[in-house]
From Swiss-Prot:
It comes from Clostridium novyi (strain NT). Pfam families: tRNA-synt_2 (PF00152), tRNA_anti-codon (PF01336). InterPro entries: Aa-tRNA-synt_II, aa-tRNA-synth_II, aa-tRNA-synth_II/BPL/LPL, Asn-tRNA-ligase, Asp/Asn-tRNA-synth_IIb, NA-bd_OB-fold, NA-bd_OB_tRNA. It is found in: Cytoplasm. The gene is asnS. One of its GO terms (cellular component) is cytoplasm. It catalyses: tRNA(Asn) + L-asparagine + ATP = L-asparaginyl-tRNA(Asn) + AMP + diphosphate + H(+). Homodimer. CDD domains: AsxRS_core (cd00776), EcAsnRS_like_N (cd04318). Belongs to the class-II aminoacyl-tRNA synthetase family. Its EC number is 6.1.1.22. This is Asparagine--tRNA ligase.
């Protein structure tokens, strides 16, 4: 007898109609009378459950009728088409075997639970409808990203998680050490002597793989990274996590416009791929999580993203007459309220904001001719704000060194990065997409903790 996934039965119903199959999964609901009963089974392969009908002719009918929610079972039976019924087909069971029983105190009973409560039981929340949908979409989106870049001829590069450099120059990094923190070795000045540490110097968890990706872009032309990054920011907002995933493409022989073109294509590709391959999940999100989600995503796919300079954005915000919590003036870092106003009230679609003041951007971004702004661009989307940040990289060694000196960065710490500018340097550009923010945008979920399997935030490292 053929063992099949529930997804196969839904996608190829006619093929299996009238045939005997075997499925395995977990009980979502069960109700029974004296003569027959119904079990909703989910095997994790598909968003929807499959209905199993079992009758009193089964020798273990009474035992089956008492199975608890979340018990795991195997079912053998015939696939029967049910025209006009709620479900398109069901399985008439000829054999039901209990694989593993569930205790009666199983937390996910048939009622609506808050997302906050479900975060406290992260080991069980994938079994709920909402999180079953979220993490299936997350999987599809990750695959879509790889497929997009592979089809475009990009090389996938694994950059280090443990690093000695700080890409952002922010200093908000998790330190990696094997020293005894209660009695660390000290140098002549009384400071911790990291020469005695495992790596012989200070080491941290990476905040970005960009600098290392640039190395490979200058050998392979177009590359991308996709991996975890870490920020030791004591921030408890719905948009920030201490551990998250980033997609970071780098392109040689490319300018700012090229990065924006690729980023726009990528975002549209991800949306289309998920819409096509997870229609049931997306309908669920549209109905129960964020009404209007599908319309908004369709608008993104079918529109040309707006492109405005930072200076233009500031002028628009100042002339809007809107009251913002953070006043708008040239030189500030745009806040989420400003970003959302631009995308939701002014343009009603995604917006690239370009040419930011150099003082609020990183050292590696290419200086513009005005010596006040850099060739940077952030992609802002309705409902969230920034999801992508990127720039053309500074390829001119003298200007890069001057910029580092201006910011107090030691050349010795970035000797290899500077050396790239000496051996066949070319214009190049890249960006970073926060994967979880993309998932939030795709699903309408309002908190980053609900699109990461095991969220890491200040004070939280369970599971």
């Amino acid at each position: 007898m053929e063992t099949v996934l529930v997804k196969q039965l839904y996608r190829e119903t006619e093929k299996f109609a009238g045939k005997e199959v075997k499925i395995s999964g977990w009980i979502r609901t069960l109700r029974a009378s004296n003569k027959f009963g119904f079990i909703e089974v989910n095997d994790g392969s598909f968003f929807k459950n499959i209905q199993v009908v079992f009758g009193a002719e089964l020798e273990n009918f009474k035992e089956i009728s008492k199975y608890a929610i979340s018990s795991s079972i195997s079912v053998e039976g015939e696939v029967v088409i049910t025209e006009g019924a709620k479900q398109p087909f069901e399985i008439h069971a000829k054999k039901v075997v209990l694989e593993g029983k569930s205790d009666a105190d199983y937390p996910l009973q048939k009622k609506r639970h808050t997302f906050e409560y479900l975060r406290s039981i992260a080991h069980l929340r994938p079994r709920s409808n909402a999180f079953s949908a979220v993490f299936r979409v997350r999987s599809l989106a990750a695959y879509a990203i790889h497929k997009f870049f592979q089809d475009q001829g990009f090389v996938y590069v694994h950059t280090p998680i443990i690093t000695g450099s700080d890409c952002e120059g922010a200093g908000e990094m998790f330190r990696v050490t094997t020293l005894d923190m209660e009695n660390p070795p000290k140098d002549e000045k009384g400071n911790v002597d990291y020469k005695e540490d495992f790596f012989g110097k200070q080491a941290n968890l990476t905040v970005s793989g960009q600098l290392e990706a640039e190395i490979y872009a200058l050998a392979f032309r177009n590359v991308y990274t996709f991996g975890p990054t870490f920020r030791a920011e004591n921030s408890n907002t719905a948009r920030h996590a201490s551990e998250f995933w980033m997609i970071e493409p780098e392109m040689a022989f490319a300018e700012l416009k090229d990065y924006m073109d690729v980023a726009e294509q990528m975002v549209k590709y991800i949306i289309n791929y998920v819409r096509e391959n997870a229609p049931e999940e997306m309908e669920f999100f549209n109905k129960f999580i964020d009404k209007g989600l599908l319309e908004r995503l369709d608008n993104v796919v079918n529109s040309d993203f707006a492109r405005i300079s930072y200076t233009e954005a500031v002028e628009i915000l100042q002339k809007s007459g809107a009251e913002f919590e953070y006043p708008v003036e040239w030189g500030i870092d745009l806040q989420t309220e400003h970003e959302r106003y631009l995308t939701e009230q002014i343009y009603k679609k995604p917006v690239f904001v370009t040419d930011y003041p150099k003082d609020i951007k990183a050292f590696y971004m290419r200086m513009n001719d005005d010596n006040k702004t850099v060739a940077a661009a952030d992609l802002l989307v309705p409902g969230i704000g920034e999801i992508i940040g990127g720039s053309q990289r500074e390829e001119r060694l003298d200007i890069l060194e001057a910029r580092m000196a201006e910011l107090g960065l030691e050349k010795e710490d970035y000797w290899w990065y500077l050396e790239l500018r000496k051996y066949g340097e070319t214009k190049h550009a890249g960006y970073g997409l926060g994967f979880e923010r993309m998932i939030m945008y795709l699903t309408g979920m309002g908190n980053i903790r609900d699109v990461i399997p095991f969220p890491r935030t200040p004070g939280v490292s369970e599971f």
